[in-house]
Amino acid sequence: MSIRLGILGLGSMGRHHVRNARATAAVDLVALADPGGDRFGVAGDLPVLGGVEELIEAGIDAAIIAAPTAHHEAAALALAEAGVHTLVEK
């Protein structure tokens, strides 16, 4: 059984989370979101979604929020309300 993971934010830290998720056997990276797109080219064959609501709609079990700090609270609250386990970057 693997964890269906989504990552919000594909900037400096998000790209590292994508790499580590892909290297972890128990993780199935299923969704990425960043309203600014994929500037580091890490998405591969995954589409880049527009935001947290689309991540939730993708049916994820867990999420990593690697977006700018100003967006943490709203994203974390939306994920919590949807029952998605979440790691929030500092």
Describe these PLM feature segments.
Residues 46-89:
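Beta-loop-alpha module in the N-terminal Rossmann-like domain of NAD(P)-dependent dehydrogenases
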Residues 1-44:
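N-terminal Rossmann-like dinucleotide-binding module
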